[in-house]
């Protein structure tokens, strides 16, 4: 059984394992560089470690593959009978990360 971990990043918790691809909130790291996630909540595999709140000494290392923007979300607001309307779009930036190792 391969090692996996649950990490906290960008206000979310994600289950990751070696070789998995995750999309996280935009990180200030250039594409091609490595990023280390220190906020590890849980490590599983042959033995499990549960953090209270974090697992001591556990890290997850990944490589930034690219940065991008998600599909556009369009919001439309209007007030009936008042000839008032507003249309607004938003594209959330993200970072694509490939997990290289889970270190417990």
From Swiss-Prot:
The subunit field of the Swiss-Prot or TrEMBL record says: Part of the 50S ribosomal subunit. Contacts protein L20.
This chain belongs to the protein called: Large ribosomal subunit protein bL21
Family from the record: Belongs to the bacterial ribosomal protein bL21 family.
| Gene Ontology biological process terms in this record | translation
Give the protein's biological function: This protein binds to 23S rRNA in the presence of protein L20.
Record key words, sorted: Ribonucleoprotein, Ribosomal protein, RNA-binding, rRNA-binding
Pfam families for the chain: Ribosomal_L21p
User: Known HAMAP family for this protein?
Assistant: Ribosomal_bL21
User: What GO CC terms are in its UniProt record?
Assistant: cytoplasm; ribonucleoprotein complex; ribosome
């Amino acid at each position: 059984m391969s090692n996996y971990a649950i990490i906290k990043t960008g206000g979310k918790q994600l289950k990751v394992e070696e070789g998995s691809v995750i999309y996280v909130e935009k990180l200030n790291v250039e594409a091609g560089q490595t990023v280390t996630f220190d906020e590890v909540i849980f490590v599983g595999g042959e033995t499990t470690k549960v953090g209270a709140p974090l697992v001591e000494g556990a890290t997850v290392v990944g490589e930034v593959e690219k940065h991008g923007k998600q599909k556009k979300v369009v919001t439309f607001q209007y007030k009936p009978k008042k000839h008032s309307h507003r249309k607004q779009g938003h594209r959330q930036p993200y970072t694509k990360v490939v997990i290289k190792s889970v270190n417990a």
